[in-house]
């Protein structure tokens, strides 16, 4: 797996608001959500930089004045990370790292890193690694010599092959290997789902925005005890279990990964084995944290992703959660 963030690095986080049409659909507290994501990655927030941007520049995403502001903060704090609450292109990320002399992450890279720390099952770890490698393959413009060492180094290169070509080939080989293993896991899940249908069991899949409280609700059923925590993406693996309530014995409950706005496409594609459990559900139980002042936006984001995943034809029942805190 790709090297993750070091222990509690100091970071400068950057919020650049875009001038967009339809701002009424924007999150009310996206900055707070992003700060929570940064903390969840193990980062200490040393400073925040705010700004607005009409059209991102091709070389740095932000304008020269903002670049200098961040550079000064990085130097003052000896920051190890600069994290953008935006999507950066590979060239923008590379150029900023040269200017700041430190590592730069965008929103996608941050979420991938959090997933890497949360994955516990074999399948979950493979899915995260596939997403990371897919993301990394678009950013292979620097030397990644650690990839060579992972496979032994000497004898890997073809005649005249550059380090960059070697790394691309190694990543391509690893991606191919992971996909084969995930396909095998996917086929096994298909067998399991067929067995459930044959046994005339109905499946209720819990869906919702990350940290909405799906897993604590799942744990209300005596036989369904899973790890739950008040932090983003505490649950990554899809788990389906029966319950011991007499009147509901034919119903199976499935807990799944939480959604988030601007979920990286690499994760959606890589988590096919997990998300397919939703496609075969008889009912989607949409868990909503109504104590969150931003819950209306998050409901829209979940419904949008449900539509994008092709799940709109499955009946949906909304469950308002955390009403005692509202």
Give names to the regions the model predicted:
Residues 1-113:
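N-terminal accessory targeting/assembly segments
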Residues 10-19, 143-283:
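Conserved G1/Walker A P-loop phosphate-binding module
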Residues 22-24, 207, 319:
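Short hydrophobic segments within beta-strands
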Residues 25-26, 53, 57-60, 87-90, ...:
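Conserved Switch II/interswitch segment of TRAFAC-class P-loop GTPases
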Residues 28-32, 64-67, 90-93, 105-108, ...:
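Amphipathic alpha-helical transducer elements in NTP-driven molecular machines
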Residues 72, 128, 135-138, 142, ...:
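Alpha-helical coiled-coil heptad-repeat segments used for dimerization/assembly
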Residues 84, 105, 253-254, 320:
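Hydrophobic residues in beta-strands of the RecA-like P-loop NTPase core, especially within AAA+ ATPase
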Residues 99-159, 312-318, 324-326:
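Canonical P-loop GTPase G-domain recognition
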């Amino acid at each position: 797996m790709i090297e993750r963030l070091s222990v509690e690095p100091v970071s400068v986080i950057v919020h650049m608001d875009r001038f967009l049409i339809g701002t009424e659909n924007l999150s009310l507290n996206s900055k707070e959500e992003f700060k929570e994501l940064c903390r969840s990655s193990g980062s200490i927030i040393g400073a925040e930089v705010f700004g607005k941007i009409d059209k991102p520049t091709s070389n740095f995403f932000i304008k020269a004045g903002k670049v200098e502001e961040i550079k000064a903060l990085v130097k003052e704090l000896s920051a190890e990370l600069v994290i953008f609450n935006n999507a950066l292109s590979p060239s923008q990320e590379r150029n900023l790292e040269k200017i700041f002399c430190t590592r730069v992450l965008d929103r996608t890279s941050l979420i991938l890193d959090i997933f890497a720390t949360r994955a516990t099952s074999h399948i979950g770890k493979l899915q995260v690694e596939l997403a990371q490698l897919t993301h990394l393959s678009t950013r292979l413009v620097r030397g990644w010599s650690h990839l060579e060492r992972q496979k032994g180094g000497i004898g890997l290169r073809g005649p005249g092959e550059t380090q960059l070509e070697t790394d691309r080939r190694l990543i391509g080989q690893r991606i191919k290997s992971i996909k084969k293993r995930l396909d095998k896991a996917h086929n096994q899940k298909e067998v399991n789902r067929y067995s459930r249908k044959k046994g005339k069991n109905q499946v209720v899949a819990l869906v919702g925005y990350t940290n909405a409280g799906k897993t604590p609700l799942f744990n209300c059923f005596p036989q369904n005890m899973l790890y739950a925590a008040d932090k983003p993406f505490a649950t990554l693996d899809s788990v389906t279990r029966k319950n011991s309530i007499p009147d509901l014995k034919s119903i199976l409950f499935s807990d799944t990964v939480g959604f988030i706005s601007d979920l990286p496409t690499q994760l959606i594609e890589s988590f096919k084995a997990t998300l397919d459990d939703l496609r075969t559900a008889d009912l989607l139980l949409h868990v909503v944290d109504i104590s969150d002042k931003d819950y209306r936006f998050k409901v829209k984001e979940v419904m949008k992703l449900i539509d994008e995943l092709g799940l709109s034809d499955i009946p949906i029942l909304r469950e308002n959660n955390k009403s005692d805190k509202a």
